[in-house]
Amino acid sequence: MSGKDQNKEYRNFSKNLILWQKDFGRHNLPWQKQTNPYRVWISEIMLQQTQVKTVLPFFEKFMKKYPDIKALSKSKIEDVFELWTGLGYYRRAENIYKSSQIIRNKHNLIFPSTFEEIINLPGIGRSTAGAILSLAFNKRYAILDGNVKRVLERYFAIKAEKNIDKELWEFSENLLPKDKNNIYSQAIMDLGATICTKKTPVCEKCPVSLDCKSLKFDLTNVIPIKRKKIIKKEKDLNYLLVVKNKNLVLMQKNPSKGIWANLWTFLNFKTRDDCKKYLKKINLTPNIYNYASIQHNLTHMKLNINIYR
């Protein structure tokens, strides 16, 4: 394909997506009703590694308590954690809180509008910065979240087990329209979320299926190539449940680094014997029993948890 033909294909891709978005894209998400940088930012952080349907009630609750950066910046981090409970990946909540302090102190409570300023906020990478700039400011920046990756891999029939982010970023930037970037960015994310899904893509309803290489060569169920699963490390945790008067529980705050950083948990020890030693130290009888044993899977780690009482 000549460079001229390729440019025409890229223009058609963005043009068709923008037209499709008007009639078939998602328009009723809560962060779309009042589009401003703050709401887009919070939604994009919440949507990192989390599905839209899970995020919806948390976003509404968050906005009710913290409707703007000023309200968030005046809060306590413990209150933000409490509001985040159940959404997971608590580092995101910490980064949101830290960012609100930076925006208050360095930007006079006005959300920054340049790529350099936004990407330097805690918890914001290249794709999240691009999403904020395109969706909230209508600036010409590319995004590359999971949905967009899948659309591009299928459209260009990229069969690769290795990391191909560099190649995908090039495609993502080349496909950008000259204007209406806010509509285009929402469109390509919606396409991946509703049409070009992981399983059973609905190709007959896809606005760019005519030039889709995977559809042409019958590869839609093969691409994206399944990457090798990462073997999770295992870690043992021993929690001690100390209860007073049936309704008071002894807790400790986790360090600022590691699993569940800065969150409150039961007392945590390396071994069962360490639990007993601690009880002796605080003049309590070291008679404990295994109250519960559970396994908990994190993205990168498998936890074997023993709870003693």
Question: Regions from the language model: what does each represent?
Answer:
Residues 1-27, 32-33, 190-309:
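Intrinsically disordered, low-complexity, charged terminal extensions of DNA damage-control enzymes
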Residues 7-202, 208-219, 282-285:
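Catalytic cores of DNA base-excision repair glycosylases
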